[in-house]
Amino acid sequence: MNTGLVVFICCVLVAVGVTLHLRKHDMLPIIHKVVDNTTATLVADTVKTKKPVVKRDFNISGSLKDTEGNGVAGVIVSDGFKCVKTDSRGRYKMKRDSLARFIYFSVPAEFEVPTHSATDRTACFYQAVSNKKKIYDFTLRRLPDGKETSYKMIVIGDPQVTNAYSPYYTSPDDNPIKKSDVERFTTQTMADIKQTIKSLPAGTPVYGLSMGDDVQYYGGYNAHLERQIRQALGSSKMRLFSVIGNHDQDGKALYRRKWEDNFGPTDFSFDRGDEHFVCINNCFFYRGKAYYSPGELRERQMRWLKQDLALTPKDKKVVLCYHIPFTFGNAPFGKAKPLGIKSEKGHYSSSRLSQLLALLHQFEGGYELFCGHTHFACNHEIRYEGEDVMEHCHAAACGNIWQSNINICGTPNGYYVYQFIGTRLTDCYYKGTFWDKNKQMTIFKAQTDFNGESYAEDWGLSKDKDKNILVANVFNADSHWRIVAIEDGKEYRMHRISSKGQDAFAAGYHHKYSESVSYRFVSKGNSYLLMNHLYYYVPKNPNARITIKASDPYGHTFTAESTDAVSEPFFNYAHYYEQENQEYKKARNSLLRDSTINRQKDSTQSNNHTKH
């Protein structure tokens, strides 16, 4: 017989025997009860551990009232994903996005810009989102005289303070000292801004706008760096907003969150006078690392922008503010369009530029495009889809990332002062840090050797190098300026250089002194660098004294003399500030005086000793 079959039959007989035994002694019902109870307990335990599904309620509401308790109607309120407007009683309601970090409003033109504190006058127009909070109320303070008809806007490109102490050659004898970037921004840029504000007529409304890259975590992460720069930016009398830059994020959620913790939302708007300012984060990172240039916007940002502009009166001027230029860049997103400009080969316009311009064309007051990022000054003008487009690309307050006092285009560290009257941009000038506001250019001799660099070689002027060719670097110039050389009482239009390339003086200077930034960044090796504010003139008489006259579109004329031409490879205007030079001379003279007095004392004591 099969062994397996025998085993099976034996098992069946045992099972039958056990069952009969249990039935005989009435044990079977007890066994069934135990099994049933055990199963019930297991099921019950399973039910207990399953958490109930809680549906979050993202519906929020609130009100905007003035200090007297009156509702403020028609104000845009947003969560960064959608926009709504307050009703006639100042109330609003919306379903916020689950990813929203802030609820905020677009500051109306008739009201003050709220700030973080009396001593930190950076804008605070938002509340952080809490899952437990359903009501977000805001109180607005009316401007004493209502909406401003005229005001100044100070625009600061790239403060870009780092956690490093960059060597800074501050004295004529090449003795480097180390100052923190925050200290330099505070004691130089902000100190000069305070003087500019002080020089304005009493009662002039002044606002500020940082174009992003407030910080860069070069030299290591510093959890306090964003707060330090916010306090510096907010230390003057102007109320200031900030755009977020690529280095404020560098593709890291921690960095971006730190910026948001200090400045609030990255996509927002506000009104001043008859202008509607829209600030938006156009730093689009590829897989969290490299960023696209020109700047780009995500689809959800375009939806937000369309809603914001749809709720904005069409008689206003729109000033679109962002960090990376939209009209040029050489690290493009796949759908970006080649510019097709021979002198700017390799540059592209943003894939969003057509859509943005279509949105901006709705506004009767026109529009302006404001950006930063480049560390060179450039009013970039292109012919785009049948339209003349200008983008104001602002030079950096930090210049070549605090390695000197100049940007890589030779423009001094500084900031811009705009004036708006109604919907008109009526004035704009560049204010070099610690420079006189009327000094708007520097003059060079084309053949001068700046540490191996020269304008004659860079721009193909070598054939006339014996004629003392003059080069004028006119910091804020564009095609609407008129730049002439006056020789023997006669005016001659200067030739404008507009192409990719370098500024010979800045390249040569930084080649020697820039320790933390590569030479490629400031030289011809930087294919991103566009130079369009250099002008040259070939004198009729190489020995003539020549006056350069630059006239801007706002009615201002600035002059410089050929005798002012920089002829030294490391001219001190980039080396140190005059204020610091005076301090240096004072200290040096004091040391010399003390040394002379000590020598005289030693001589007197020696003579007395000899007599004895």
Task: Please annotate each region the language model reported.
Residues 109-116, 123-132, 219-313, 336-368, ...:
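Extended active-site neighborhood of metal-dependent phosphoesterases/phosphodiesterases
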Residues 388-477, 481-488, 529-562, 591-592:
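Binuclear metal-dependent phosphoesterase catalytic core
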Residues 93-102:
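Short Pro-Gly-centered beta-turn/loop motif in secreted/extracellular proteins
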Residues 502-537:
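Aromatic sugar-binding surface patches on proteins
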Residues 30-59, 97, 112-222:
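N-terminal active-site segment of His-dependent metallophosphoesterases
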Residues 75, 81-94, 496-502:
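Short, acidic Ser/Thr/Gly-rich low-complexity loop/linker segments typical of extracellular
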Residues 56-57, 63, 68, 74-85:
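Short amphipathic beta-strand segments in non-cytosolic proteins
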Residues 60-66, 90, 138:
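A short, amphipathic beta-strand motif
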